[in-house]
Structures are given as C-alpha cells and as structure tokens.
C-alpha cells in the first residue's frame, strides 16, 4: 500500500476520534442535565408530600420574586403535579437521547478499532518488506 493510503487512513482515524470525543462530551452534558432534573424531581415530590399533609383550609404561599403570594391549596397541588409530569417526561426524553448517543459511541469505537487494526496490519506489512 502507498504512503498516501496510510495517510488517508490516519486522517480518517483522527476524524473518527474527534467525532467520538464530541459524542462523549454530549453524553457528559446529558448526564449533567439528567442529574439536575433528577434533583428537581425529588424536590417536587417532597413538596407534593408536604402539600398532601395539609388540611383543605391551610394557607399556602408561593414565592414570586421577593414576594410571598397566597395560593389556593388545590392550585398549588396541581402546579406541583404538572411540574412532576414535565420533569418525568424530560427524564424519559433524556434517557432516549442518552441511549442513542451511547449506541453511536459504541459504533464509533468499533470503527476506530477496525481502522487501527487495518493501519497496524499495513504498517506491519511494510516493516516486513
């Protein structure tokens, strides 16, 4: 094989390695975002448990900017449930994206390994010649 073929393979290997790095960075971002949503889900579930403990005529206040505003218990309950639904849906979406990215990562790794083996075979053949 010619040295230009080896150079092309090396360039291709470098490009694939860069792509793999980008995928891994995206996976890291996804994990961070997922962690944030998981924390928010836990906090909202705690709020919901606290709201469930209250009597029907209890006063509930919502912090809006620097001001506490009185809110109806049923409305507060509904808002927290909607938030939990939204966060749960986001977590499912992130899980699907993560699964897709991990598949892409595995495919890139396989491609990189095949390219490396091919390069090593070519270079070993040149060394014998």
UniProtKB/Swiss-Prot annotation:
One of its GO terms (cellular component) is cytoplasm. CDD domains: Prefoldin_6. Disruption phenotype: Several microtubules (MTs) defects, including hypersensitivity to oryzalin (a microtubule inhibitor), defects in cell division, abnormal cortical array organization, and impaired microtubule dynamicity, due to reduced tubulins levels. Reduced levels of PIN2 at the plasma membrane. The pfd5 pfd6 double mutant is less sensitive to gibberellic acid (GA)-mediated mobilization of PIN2 at the plasma membrane. Lower pre-mRNA splicing events and reduced production of U6 snRNA in plants lacking PFD2, PFD4 and PFD6, probably due to a reduced activity of the LSM2-8 complex. The keyword Coiled coil applies. This is Prefoldin subunit 6. InterPro entries: PFD_beta-like, Prefoldin. Keywords: Chaperone, Coiled coil, Cytoplasm, Nucleus. Heterohexamer of two PFD-alpha type and four PFD-beta type subunits forming prefoldin co-chaperone complex. Interacts with PFD2, PFD3, PFD4 and PFD5. Interacts with LSM8, a specific subunit of the LSM2-8 complex, which is a core component of the spliceosome. Binds to HSP90 to facilitate the formation of a larger complex made at least of HSP90, PFD6 and LSM8. It is found in: Cytoplasm; Nucleus. Induction: Accumulates in response to cold. The gene is PFD6. Belongs to the prefoldin subunit beta family. Its main location: cytoplasm. Transmembrane segments: none annotated. Binds specifically to cytosolic chaperonin (c-CPN) and transfers target proteins to it. Binds to nascent polypeptide chain and promotes folding in an environment in which there are many competing pathways for nonnative proteins. Together with other chaperonins, contribute to the regulation of gene expression by modulating the spliceosome function on pre-mRNA splicing post-transcriptionally by acting as a co-chaperone of Hsp90 to control levels of LSM8. Residues 6-26, 84-118 form a coiled coil. GO terms for molecular function: Hsp90 protein binding; unfolded protein binding. GO terms for biological process: cellular response to gibberellin stimulus; cortical microtubule organization; mRNA processing; protein folding; protein localization involved in auxin polar transport; response to cold. It holds the Pfam family Prefoldin_2.
């Amino acid at each position: 094989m010619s040295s230009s073929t080896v150079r092309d393979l090396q360039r291709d290997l470098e490009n694939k390695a860069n792509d793999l790095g980008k995928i891994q960075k995206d996976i890291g971002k996804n994990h961070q975002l997922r962690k944030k949503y998981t924390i928010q889900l836990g906090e909202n579930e705690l709020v919901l448990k606290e709201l469930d403990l209250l009597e029907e005529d209890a006063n509930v206040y919502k912090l809006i900017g620097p001001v506490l505003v009185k809110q109806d218990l049923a409305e507060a309950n509904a808002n927290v449930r909607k938030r939990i639904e939204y966060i749960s849906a986001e977590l499912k979406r992130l899980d699907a994206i993560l699964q897709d990215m991990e598949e892409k990562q595995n495919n890139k790794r396989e491609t990189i390994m095949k390219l490396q083996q091919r390069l090593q075979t070519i270079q070993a053949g040149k060394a014998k010649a």
